[in-house]
UniProtKB/Swiss-Prot annotation:
<comment type="similarity">
    <text>Belongs to the plant acyltransferase family.</text>
</comment>
<keyword id="KW-0808">Transferase</keyword>
<comment type="function">
    <text>Acyltransferase involved in the production of green leaf volatiles (GLVs). Uses acetyl-CoA as substrate, but not malonyl-CoA or benzoyl-CoA. Prefers primary, medium-chain-length, aliphatic alcohols.</text>
</comment>
<keyword id="KW-0012">Acyltransferase</keyword>
<dbReference type="Pfam" id="PF02458">
    <property type="entry name" value="Transferase"/>
</dbReference>
<dbReference type="GO" id="GO:0010597">
    <property type="term" value="P:green leaf volatile biosynthetic process"/>
</dbReference>
<feature type="active site" description="Proton acceptor">
    <location>
        <position position="174"/>
    </location>
</feature>
<dbReference type="GO" id="GO:0010327">
    <property type="term" value="F:acetyl CoA:(Z)-3-hexen-1-ol acetyltransferase activity"/>
</dbReference>
<dbReference type="InterPro" id="IPR023213">
    <property type="entry name" value="CAT-like_dom_sf"/>
</dbReference>
<feature type="active site" description="Proton acceptor">
    <location>
        <position position="389"/>
    </location>
</feature>
<dbReference type="InterPro" id="IPR050898">
    <property type="entry name" value="Plant_acyltransferase"/>
</dbReference>
<protein>
    <recommendedName>
        <fullName>(Z)-3-hexen-1-ol acetyltransferase</fullName>
        <ecNumber>2.3.1.195</ecNumber>
    </recommendedName>
</protein>
<dbReference type="GO" id="GO:0102165">
    <property type="term" value="F:(Z)-3-hexen-1-ol acetyltransferase activity"/>
</dbReference>
C-alpha cells in the first residue's frame, strides 16, 4: 500500500514523501502465556482513561550496522509479551462498568512500512515535533482497532527511512498503563532487543492494590476534578482547532521566573504551568466569572506506603487534582496567584487522597473528569522516553507523545524533553486552540517573554 504524504506549507518546507505499508499482522507472545481474566484497578478503568494515546520515536541511521529495526523490534515485542502478556489480550467490560483484561494471547497489531524520506529532510522541515502532520501514515489507524473494548491493546508501526534511520510509533490503551508504566514496558522492550533474556525490572500486575469494594469505599476528600459537568468547554466549541509546539529553554524559564517574587521557590513545572495557564486563559477570552481549571497529572507511586507498590507495577498510578480560579482572577492578578494555586494543588496529594479517588470511582460509577474550562498538563520529562534505545541506532532524536490533546479533550498538553537543531535542550509543549485564540496566545506568550527577557 503506497500513500503520498505532503507536509503543510504553513509548518514545513512543503516536503512530501511516500509511505509503503505491508499488510498488518498480529504479534503474539513468543511462548505460551496464562489464560485468565485480570480486573483493572479503580484508577485504571475510570471513564476519563478510556481512550488510546499515540507516541512516536525518530532514530538516526547507523550505517555500520546491518540489523533491520523492523525485525529487531518485532522479535523483541514477541519476547516482551511473554512478560507483559496482558497486553496481548483484549479488554472486556463486566458488571458496574468494571474493566478486565481477557488474557487471550491474541497479540498486538504490528505494521511494517517504508518511507522514501530521510530523517535529515524531516529535521530540516521542522517536522520532528508534534503535532506531526503525517502521523496517520506513520501510525496507521487499522480499521476497528481504535475502540477500547475487544480490540488489540497495542498498535505498533516501524517505518524504515531511506537514510537507514527509522520511526517507531506506538498507540496504547490508557486504561492499561500510564506514562511511567509505558516507560517500564518500553525499557523492557529495549533490553530484550539488545540481548537480555528477561527484563531487569520484572512487570507486576497487582491491580487489586488500587481497588476497593463499594461497601468498603470511603471518600475522604473533596474531588472537584470529578464535579458534575457544567457549561461548555471553551476549547471544544465547534471552532476549528490548530495545534502548535512551543520550545522552552532554560532562558525562557528564567524569563518567566522574573515575573514572580524572587523569594518564591518554584519548580520549572510550576513556573511554566502557571504561565501557560494564564496565557491560555487570556487567549480563550472567557466570561470573567468562568471557572478555569488547571489539572496536574501527578504520578502518585511515591505516595503509596501502605502497602507500597513494587517497582515493576505498570498500571495507572496518578491522580488529577485541579487548581481552580475565575478567569478574572487569573488574568488580573499577578502570576504568583496562579503559581501558588498549583503548588497548593500538588501538595494536597497524599496516600489518603489517592485512596479516596479509588473509593470515588467505586461508588460513583467511574465518572469522567471535568472537561469544561480545563487545561490538563502531564509532565513526561522524568519518564526517560527520550532514552528508548534499541541498540545500534542509539537514543531517539524525538521521543514522546505524538499530538496535542487526547481523544475528545483538546485541552491537554504534555511536557516532553527535546534537543533542537542547535543542540539546545529544553521542553516541548504542544498546544491546541481555536485559530483566533492561538494567534492571541502566541502574541501574549511572545510579548511577555520578550519584555521579561529585556
Amino acid at each position: 500500500m503506497d500513500h503520498q504524504v505532503s507536509l503543510p506549507q504553513s509548518t514545513t518546507t512543503g516536503l512530501s514523501f511516500k509511505v509503503h505499508r505491508q499488510q498488518r499482522e498480529l504479534v503474539t507472545p513468543a511462548k505460551p502465556t496464562p489464560r485468565e481474566l485480570k480486573p483493572l484497578s479503580d484508577i485504571d478503568d475510570q471513564q476519563g482513561l478510556r481512550f488510546q494515546i499515540p507516541v512516536i520515536f525518530f532514530y538516526r541511521p547507523n550505517l555500520s550496522s546491518d540489523l533491520d529495526p523492523v525485525q529487531v523490534i518485532k522479535k523483541a515485542l514477541a519476547d516482551a509479551l511473554v512478560y507483559y502478556y496482558p497486553f496481548a489480550g483484549r479488554l472486556r467490560e463486566l458488571s458496574n462498568r468494571k474493566l478486565a483484561v481477557d488474557c487471550t494471547g491474541e497479540g498486538v497489531l504490528f505494521i511494517e512500512a517504508e518511507a522514501d524520506v530521510a530523517l535529515a529532510e524531516l529535521e530540516e522541515a521542522d517536522a520532528l515535533l508534534p503535532p506531526f502532520p503525517f502521523l496517520e501514515e506513520l501510525l496507521f489507524d487499522v480499521e476497528g482497532s481504535s475502540d477500547v473494548l475487544n480490540t488489540p491493546l497495542l498498535l505498533v508501526q516501524v517505518t524504515r527511512l531511506k537514510c537507514c534511520g527509522f520511526i517507531f510509533a506506538l498507540r496504547f490503551n490508557h486504561t492499561m498503563t500510564d506514562g511511567a508504566g509505558l516507560s517500564l514496558f518500553l525499557k523492557s522492550l529495549c533490553e530484550l532487543a539488545c540481548g537480555l533474556h528477561a527484563p531487569s525490572v520484572p512487570p507486576v500486575w497487582n491491580r487489586h492494590l488500587l481497588t476497593v469494594s463499594a461497601s468498603e469505599a470511603r471518600v475522604t476528600h473533596t474531588h472537584r476534578e470529578y464535579d458534575d459537568q457544567v457549561g461548555i468547554d471553551v476549547v471544544a466549541t465547534g471552532h476549528p482547532l490548530v495545534s502548535r509546539s512551543f520550545f522552552f529553554r532554560a532562558e525562557e524559564i528564567s524569563a518567566i521566573r522574573k515575573l514572580l517574587p524572587p523569594d518564591l521557590h518554584n519548580t520549572s513545572f510550576e513556573a511554566l504551568s502557571s504561565f501557560l495557564w494564564r496565557c491560555r486563559t487570556i487567549a480563550l477570552n472567557p466570561d470573567p466569572n468562568t471557572e478555569m481549571r488547571l489539572t496536574c497529572i501527578i504520578n502518585s507511586r511515591s505516595k503509596l506506603r501502605n502497602p507500597p507498590l513494587e517497582p515493576g507495577y505498570y498500571g495507572n498510578v496518578f491522580v488529577i487534582p485541579a487548581a481552580i480560579a475565575t478567569a478574572r482572577d487569573l488574568i488580573e492578578k499577578p502570576l504568583e496567584f496562579a503559581l501558588r494555586l498549583i503548588q497548593e494543588t500538588k501538595s494536597s496529594v497524599t496516600e489518603d487522597y489517592v485512596r479516596s479517588v479509588t473509593a470515588l470511582m467505586a461508588t460513583r460509577g467511574r465518572p469522567m473528569f471535568v472537561a469544561s474550562g480545563n487545561y490538563i498538563i502531564s509532565d513526561l520529562r522524568h519518564f526517560d522516553l527520550g532514552k528508548i534505545d534499541f541498540g545500534p541506532w542509539g537514543k531517539p532524536v524525538y521521543g514522546g507523545t505524538a499530538k496535542a490533546g487526547i481523544a475528545l479533550f483538546p485541552g491537554v498538553s504534555f511536557y516532553v524533553p527535546f534537543k533542537n537543531k542547535k543542540g539546545e535542550t529544553g521542553t516541548v509543549v504542544a498546544i491546541s486552540l481555536p485559530v483566533r485564540a492561538m494567534e492571541t496566545f502566541v502574541a501574549e506568550l511572545n510579548g511577555v517573554l520578550n519584555v521579561s527577557k529585556g
